[in-house]
Structures are given as C-alpha cells and as structure tokens.
C-alpha cells in the first residue's frame, strides 16, 4: 500500500524531496521510478510533474486512463517505470552536446518501443506483422525499414533541442490493424485488440486464404469461388461480372468466326480452280484448310443442325444462355442471296445471249434454261438451284416449298414486280413498233409487205430486232390483245356520245376536222371501217333528237292540265316575264353563235363544209329555242 500511495502521489505531482526515505529498499519498479524522481527533483519542480502525470492521461507513456483500476495498474507497472526512467535520463542530459543527445534519444526510443513488443512478430516503426523470425530479420535489413529510420532521424534533426519532446511524439503515434481496419492511439489498446478473439478469427481466415491462393486453380469455377470467399471475409462485395462477360464475348466471337469463315471459304473456292473443292459437296461443310486455322473446330459436323445442337449443349453446361439468332439470320441472308442471284442471272444471261452470235443463241431454245453465265456461278449455292426448270412457274413453286419447309415466309414479290415491269416495257415496245412499221412500209416498196395481209401485223424485220428473251406465248397473247383493242376501237367511238344538243354543236366541228385528218393519215384499207363508224354516230344523234322531241310533247300535255287550275291574273304576269326572258336569251344565243362562227371559220378548210355546218346549226338553234321555251314553261308551271 505504501508503494501504491507513493506512486499515486508521485504521478499526481505531490511528491516531496523526502519521499525516498519512506520507501523500502526493494528493487521494485515504482521505487526505482520514485528514486529517479527524487534525484531529479532539483531539476523538475512539482508543477511540471503534475503536468506529466494526471489522473486521466500519462504523457510519458501516452496512455488514456479512464478508470481508477487502470490508473493503479498502469502507474504500478514495469513499463511505466521504464518510460519514466528513460524520460528523466533524457532530460537530465539536456545540457550536453545536442547532436549526441539526439542520436542517443532516437536509439533509446526505438529500443524502448521494441522492448514491449517482440521484434520477430511486429515492427512498431513500420507497423508490420511477421509470421517467422526470418521474415522479420529480412525486414529489418531491408530498404523499407532503413528508409523509415532515416526519415525519423531527419525529423528529429530539423527540430530544435529545446523544443524536442519525445513524449509528444510517442503520444501522437497511431497503431493500425489492417485486417480489421481499426486504428489505435495507444500501444496497450492495440495489443489487447491483437489478442482478442475477433481479430484472431479474421487473422486465421486470411492466413488460410493466403495459403490456398498459392496453389494453381484447376478451373475458373474454383478460382471464382475462392475469390468470392476472400471478398466476403473482407466484408466487400464480390464482383464476378467481368470474367463472365469475357467468357460470353469469347464464345460469341469464336462462333462468329465459324459463321464468318464460311463466306470466306466460298470466296476462296471462287478464286481457286473448281477441281480442288469437288470433294466437299455439302453447302455447309467447312474445308480442312479453314478448320486447321480455327483453334476450337476440332470436330467436323455433317450439317449445321448438329453443330448448333452441340453449341447449345456447351452453353447450357456452362450456365449461359445460348444465342442462336446470329446463325439463323446468316442462313436466311445466304438463301435469299442465292435465289436473288438466280433471278438476276436471267436478264444478265439474256443480255449475253444477245451479244453472242445468232447461232449460239439458237442452241438455247427454252427461255428459262440456265445459260453459260449461270453455269459459271459458284458451287456453294443450294443443291435445288442446280435444277433446270421448263418455266418460271415451276421454279417459283419449288422455291416456295423450300421456304415453307424451313419455316420462312416465301417472298414472291421481287420476281412478280420484275415481270410486270418487263411486260409493260414489252407492250410499249410493241405499240411503239407499229408507227415505225408503218413508216417503214411507206418508205419501202409495197412488195416487201405483201405476205402480211393484216393491217396491224409486225414484219419479221422488226421482230428480229426485238430481244430474244420474249417467249412465244407472250407474243401470241400480245397479238391477240392488239386485235381485241382494234375491235373495241371500231365498235366504240374514241370520244363519248354527247347527251345534250349543246355538246353536239360544240363537238360537231371537231368531229369533222378529225375525220378529215384521219382520212389523210389512214390507208385505203381502213376507209370502210371508219365510214361504218360515222354512220353509227349519225344514227345515234338522230335517236337523241327524236327523244328530245317526244319529251316536250309529253310535258306540254301535263302543263295544259295544270293551266286549267290556275288563276288568270297569275297567267298574265308569268307570260310577261316569260317573254322578257326569252328575248334576252335569244340575244345572248345570237351573240354566242356569231362568236362561234368566227372561230369555226378559221378551222374549216373548205367552203362546202362551212355551208353544211351553218345549215345544221340553224336547225339546231331553232330546235333549241323551242326546247328552251318548253323547258321554261315546265319550270314556271304553265
């Protein structure tokens, strides 16, 4: 109890010069500390001691003292006595040479710090732990530890001797546990944490993981599981997406190389002679030269279906979603490309046939047989494209069956549009040939065309100039359509028949002019047909005139019945209004007739025709006025 009271008095700053007399002559650490304090009492007064040793903090050791039991155990301990003796030794030699004192302080300070902790397990300066004495020894000899010592020496050299306080430097030191990520300001707290159960568990986990990480991983799955366990032990979220994405990208890249190698292989087949590739009949087999270049294509597949099934199994075994869309699109594009080449090869081959001699073109009588240009197409086209078809209909039906068997919708519009455009183009050529043919008939003697009695038949000279791709049945259909059009032209007039008398008057002059021009342009063989057509027109006009006369007679009978029921006063007023309107209309009609006569005088080529038209117009004007009068009576209610 005496030693405890002495140490407490000593730490509180109430110790006196005669305290050493009451202490027993033992070699305990508190006694030695009090003796050191007694010897240095002349240098250090009580106020300075009170500042160093307080009830809550020991500045010499840099330890926080929260409870009374902590204060008692700390001040009675050997570590506190060593720190106090070291502190008073340093301050007792304050009047000596500064350089020597600084060097001695650094060495003693390091020794003091290493005395508390085993050097083979922990380096207080570098804050590093060691699992064996050999590793610790190599660390102390190494550059890192030497560099830290040098930095500490430089910091102490820069500071002034009077301002240097080792207890402050010691108190500012922090201790960090990198496994638990915790920092401590005191060495005792750090030691207690290192000896705790929580730290020991984490340390054992980390050591086991480090030992296991040295062995080589048999597969990526084991490596990934190891990595996840380490991250979970550290309390971090494991990131497993980067390796998975890499695998998927590699897989898709490899299978795309397989897909892309096929068109390259076909291009290679086109460049090299055909004999080198006759052994590969199937369109989807890859040649041995290309398979050797691919790193993973060790297996040869009889068809794409087997290869796709193998790929799906591999992807499912790896836990990935098999992507089967890129290969399907590729097949569709290849098929449509093949059929389009077959369709496009037709016009090209026909153009080439026109450029060849006539004897060479005679050997290809059927229009849909494969031409020499089609025989030069690459051999990687589907097997059904090698067949010869008698007509395009058979070829189209075969194509539709193939597309339906593959589960695709057959596209038949591209050939249909081309046919319609070709047909219209051919019809225009046939129509355009007729005036040219007639011009040739006018220029050439008549003897050359005696064999063709029909007026619209085409000569062999013009037929030879047409392209050879026209089928025989097409020409027959066109001739039949032309003859049908001629019959319809003869049966029906080129312009509709007018319904009213005004339209008849307006169109009579144009009909006469057109008839004369048509007579000059047409040949002698067509005169009879046109005369018959004019007779029919005149008969229709007469019918319309008779119907116009019958209508007003019926209307007059109806209006006479109505007159008997009306008043006489109203009759007088209406008759006066009717006469005024009739006079105005007669004036307007006479002015219009004069204007029309002037216009038609310029158009009529001869005087005889003018006289005929005047007579017809006078009759029509009289009929028109009577008709208008009857029409007005019917409207006004007479």
Swiss-Prot record:
Q: Which Pfam families match?
A: zf-met
Q: InterPro entries in the record, alphabetically?
A: Matrin/U1-like-C_Znf_C2H2, Znf_C2H2_sf, Znf_C2H2_type
> Which Gene3D superfamilies does the UniProt record give?
Classic Zinc Finger
Q: Where in the cell is it found?
A: Nucleus
| Coiled coil ranges | none
Q: Which GO terms describe its cellular component?
A: nucleus
Keyword tags:
DNA-binding, Metal-binding, Nucleus, Repeat, Zinc, Zinc-finger
Q: What is its main location?
A: nucleus
Zn finger spans (Matrin-type): 56-86, 121-151, 172-206
Instruction: Kindly give the SUPFAM superfamilies that the UniProt entry links to this protein.
Output: beta-beta-alpha zinc fingers (SSF57667)
Q: Name one GO molecular function term.
A: zinc ion binding
Q: Does Nucleus show up as a keyword for this record?
A: yes
- Give the residue ranges for region: Disordered: 496-638
Q: Where are the transmembrane segments?
A: none
Q: Where is the composition biased (Basic and acidic residues)?
A: 544-556, 571-587
Ranges annotated as biased composition (Polar residues): 500-513
Q: Where is the composition biased (Basic residues)?
A: 533-543, 592-601
Q: Which PANTHER family match?
A: LYSINE-RICH COILED-COIL PROTEIN 1 (PTHR46742), ZINC FINGER MATRIN-TYPE PROTEIN 1 (PTHR46742:SF2)
Q: What is this protein called?
A: Zinc finger matrin-type protein 1
Q: Which organism is it from?
A: Homo sapiens
């Amino acid at each position: 109890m005496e030693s405890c009271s002495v140490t407490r008095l000593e730490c509180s700053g109430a110790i006196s010069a005669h305290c050493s007399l009451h202490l027993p002559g033992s070699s305990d650490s508190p006694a030695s500390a009090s003796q050191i304090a007694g010897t240095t009492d002349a240098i250090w007064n009580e106020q300075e001691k009170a500042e160093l040793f307080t009830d809550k903090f020991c500045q010499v050791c840099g330890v926080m003292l929260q409870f009374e039991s902590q204060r008692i155990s700390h001040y009675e301990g050997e570590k506190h006595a060593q720190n106090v003796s070291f502190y008073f030794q340093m301050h007792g030699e304050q009047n000596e040479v500064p350089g020597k004192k600084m060097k001695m302080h650094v060495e003693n300070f390091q020794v003091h710090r290493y005395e508390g902790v085993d050097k083979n397990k922990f380096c207080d300066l570098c804050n590093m732990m060691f699992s064996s004495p050999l590793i610790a020894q190599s660390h102390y000899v190494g550059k890192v530890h030497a560099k830290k010592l040098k930095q500490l020496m430089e910091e102490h050299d820069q500071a002034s001797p009077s301002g240097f306080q080792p207890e402050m430097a010691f108190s500012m030191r922090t201790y960090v546990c990198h496994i638990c990520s915790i920092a401590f300001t005191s060495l005792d707290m750090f030691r207690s944490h290192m000896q705790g159960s929580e730290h020991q568990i984490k340390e054992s986990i980390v050591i086991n993981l480090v030992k296991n990480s040295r062995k080589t991983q048999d597969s990526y799955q084991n490596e990934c599981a190891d990595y996840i366990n380490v991250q979970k032990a550290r309390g971090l979220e494991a990131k497993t997406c980067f390796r998975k994405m890499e695998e998927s990208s590699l897989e898709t890249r490899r299978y795309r190389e397989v897909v892309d190698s096929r068109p390259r292989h076909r291009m290679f087949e086109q460049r090299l002679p055909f004999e080198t590739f006759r052994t590969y009949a199937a369109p989807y087999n890859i040649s041995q030269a290309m398979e050797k270049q691919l790193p993973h294509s060790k297996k040869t597949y009889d068809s794409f279906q087997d290869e796709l099934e193998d790929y799906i199994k591999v992807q499912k075994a790896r836990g990935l979603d098999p992507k089967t869309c890129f290969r399907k699109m590729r097949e569709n594009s290849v098929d449509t490309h093949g059929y389009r080449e077959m369709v496009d090869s037709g016009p090209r081959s026909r153009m080439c046939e026109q450029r060849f001699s006539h004897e060479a073109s005679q050997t290809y009588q059927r229009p849909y047989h494969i031409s020499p240009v089609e025989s030069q197409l690459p051999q990687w086209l589907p097997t059904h494209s090698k067949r010869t078809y008698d007509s395009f209909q058979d070829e189209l039906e075969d194509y539709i069956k193939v597309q339906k068997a593959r589960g695709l919708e057959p596209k038949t519009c591209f050939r249909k549009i081309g046919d319609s455009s070709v047909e219209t183009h051919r019809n225009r050529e046939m129509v355009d040939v007729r005036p040219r043919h007639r011009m040739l008939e006018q220029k050439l003697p008549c003897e050359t065309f005696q064999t063709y009695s029909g007026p619209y038949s085409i000569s062999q000279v013009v037929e030879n100039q047409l392209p050879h791709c026209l089928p025989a049945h097409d020409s027959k259909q066109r001739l039949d359509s032309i003859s049908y059009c001629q019959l319809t032209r003869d049966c029906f007039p080129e312009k509709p028949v007018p319904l009213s008398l005004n339209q008849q008057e307006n169109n009579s002059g144009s009909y006469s002019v057109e008839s004369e021009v048509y007579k000059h342009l047409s040949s002698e063989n067509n005169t009879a047909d046109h005369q018959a057509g004019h007779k029919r027109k005149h008969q229709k006009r007469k019918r319309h005139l008779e119907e116009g006369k019958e209508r007003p007679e019926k209307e007059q009978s109806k209006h006479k019945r109505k007159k008997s029921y009306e008043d006489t006063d109203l009759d007088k007023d209406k008759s006066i209004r009717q006469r005024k309107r009739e006079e105005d209309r007669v004036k307007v009609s006479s002015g219009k007739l004069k204007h029309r006569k002037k216009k038609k005088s310029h158009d009529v080529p001869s005087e005889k025709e003018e006289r005929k038209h005047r007579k017809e117009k006078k009759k029509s004007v009289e009929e028109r006025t009577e008709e208008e009068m009857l029409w007005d009576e019917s409207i006004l209610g007479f």
